[in-house]
């Protein structure tokens, strides 16, 4: 199961709009780390990773140190906590997918999150725990993050998750909103795949804006 824009939606017009709230946090203010710099430092970190490994998946420490190379581990941790708090404030669960998780659990099926994200597994688990109903969160068996494995879903994260779980591809159904990452890449890995097309793009954007207004 995909995470962002499938299980969790952000109450913003675009995902990067979270950074405009993030730049108001004490940790980011101290460094004058604004939304624009957060975007450019992620791009720089990805370019550097491509040069070094041929792949583009990065972690939060790599992103932060692309902007501020001399950050201490404590400063990195403080920035990550601020970013997690901003995501917790912005994200909400998509009810049909929550019900899908509950239905899977009732049938005795395992639920696994596979996400293209710069969050590591502990941070993503905390985000899920803070935003999902408790029963839905407890139904999640495993979490795989592209940042931890160095591969996006398009680059082979599905196959690495299967290898870790020791299950055959055809025993798995992957559900997600992104046609390339969640449908095509999962199919290439041998999984059953379902493309969760929520709405026409203008409707999805309107729902995000409504969520922002309601919050």
Could you tell me what each predicted segment is?
Residues 210-215:
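Charged, amphipathic alpha-helical linkers/stalks
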Residues 175, 180-208:
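Acidic, Mg2+-coordinating phosphoryl-transfer loop and its flanking beta/alpha structural elements
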Residues 1-12:
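Asp-based phosphoryl-transfer active-site loop
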Residues 18-82:
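A metal-dependent, Asp-based hydrolase signature
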Residues 90-91, 122, 132, 157-160, ...:
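A generic "structured core" feature
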Residues 76-92, 97-130, 140-145:
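Substrate-recognition element of Asp-dependent hydrolases with the DxDx(T/V) motif
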Residues 145-152, 158:
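Catalytic cores of eukaryotic secretory-pathway lumenal/extracellular enzymes that build
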Residues 154-180:
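Conserved Lys-Pro-Asp/Glu-containing loop-to-beta segment of HAD-superfamily phosphomonoesterases
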């Amino acid at each position: 199961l995909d995470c962002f824009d499938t299980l969790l939606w952000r109450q913003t017009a675009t995902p990067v709009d979270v950074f405009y709230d993030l730049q108001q946090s004490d940790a980011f203010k101290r460094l004058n780390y604004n939304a624009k710099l957060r975007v450019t430092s992620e791009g720089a970190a990805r370019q550097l990773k491509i040069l070094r490994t041929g792949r583009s998946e990065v972690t939060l420490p790599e992103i932060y140190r692309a902007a501020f190379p001399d950050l201490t581990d404590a400063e990195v941790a403080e920035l990550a906590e601020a970013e997690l708090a901003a995501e917790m404030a912005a994200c909400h669960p998509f009810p049909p997918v929550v019900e899908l998780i509950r239905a899977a659990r009732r049938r005795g099926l395992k639920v696994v999150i596979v996400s293209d994200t710069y969050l590591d597994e502990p941070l993503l688990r905390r985000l899920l725990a803070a935003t999902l109903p408790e029963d839905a969160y407890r139904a999640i068996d495993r979490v795989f993050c592209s940042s931890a494995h160095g591969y996006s879903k398009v680059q082979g994260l599905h196959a690495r998750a299967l290898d870790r779980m020791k299950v055959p591809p055809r025993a798995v159904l992957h559900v997600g909103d992104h046609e390339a990452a969640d449908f095509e890449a999962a199919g290439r890995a041998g999984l059953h795949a379902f493309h969760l097309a929520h709405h026409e793009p203008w409707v999805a954007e309107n729902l995000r804006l409504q969520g922002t207004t309601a919050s």
